[in-house]
């Protein structure tokens, strides 16, 4: 189930935030069949065609969620688990490595204010995508780098952005990007205490070992 009291992490200044009246309604149509399950989507009502979902795995989801919710144009964020075999896994089960899930941030964004490529640019530079199944001292398949796309358009943009970032990483002596780019499976909300963890604990753990290499500005012109 969605975390209790789930609210927009970064509501836009003019509209777009979830209203209390709409909370709890079940969505009849979602952006793509590959989006989160309708049960979970009941708490993330898509209020216009300009709102979309994106899913990213960058290691520990605490710090990643904070980076995304601070971006102007994101209207909701939540953390959870994707890409595993067990239904509705617990944090302990995911951390055991036995379920195959990755820690993931779900980002709802207003495409009239921020693009999917903007989110990808933040994704690539907030972690080290060349380290397989680890970020800094966090080691395990749950910390793998991953993009779960919700449409063919997202898939194409993600693949092109990977190529663009790989080119600049290679020039700077880094190895091959290990990020998996896959269709979005079901998203399982993480436990309540994980949601916006660093808002509740500003000095909490935020382990992201970045490459320090900026995403190439010219890549936006090509994609």
Show where each model-derived region lies.
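Secretory pathway export signals and precursors
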Residues: 11-12, 31, 56, 203
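N-terminal, intrinsically disordered charge-dense segments
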Residues: 5, 26-42
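Flexible coil/turn and secondary-structure edge motifs
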Residues: 42-223
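Short glycine-rich, low-complexity segments
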Residues: 5-7, 18
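Compositionally biased amphipathic helical and low-complexity segments enriched in hydrophobic
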Residues: 19, 23-27, 45, 52
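Intrinsically disordered, low-complexity segments enriched in serine/threonine/proline/glycine
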Residues: 10, 20-21, 29, 40
């Amino acid at each position: 189930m969605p975390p209790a009291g789930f609210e927009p992490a970064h509501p836009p200044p003019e509209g777009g935030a979830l209203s209390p009246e709409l909370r709890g309604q079940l969505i009849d149509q979602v952006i793509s069949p590959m989006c989160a399950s309708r049960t979970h989507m009941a708490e993330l009502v898509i209020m216009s065609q300009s709102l979309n979902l994106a899913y990213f795995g960058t290691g520990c989801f605490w710090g990643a969620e904070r980076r995304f919710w601070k971006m102007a144009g994101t209207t909701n964020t939540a953390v959870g688990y994707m890409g595993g075999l067990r239904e509705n896994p617990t944090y302990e089960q995911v951390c055991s490595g036995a379920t195959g899930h990755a820690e993931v941030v779900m980002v709802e964004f207003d495409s009239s204010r921020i693009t999917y490529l903007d989110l990808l640019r933040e994704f690539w530079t907030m972690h080290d995508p060349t380290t397989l199944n680890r970020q800094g001292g966090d080691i395990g398949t749950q910390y793998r780098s991953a993009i779960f796309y919700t449409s063919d358009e997202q898939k194409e943009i993600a693949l092109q952005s990977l190529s663009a970032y790989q080119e600049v990483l290679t020039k700077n002596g880094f190895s091959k990007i290990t990020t998996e780019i896959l269709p979005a499976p079901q998203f399982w909300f993480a436990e309540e205490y994980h949601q916006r963890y660093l808002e509740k604990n500003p000095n909490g753990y935020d382990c992201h070992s970045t490459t320090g290499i900026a995403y190439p500005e010219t890549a936006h012109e090509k994609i």
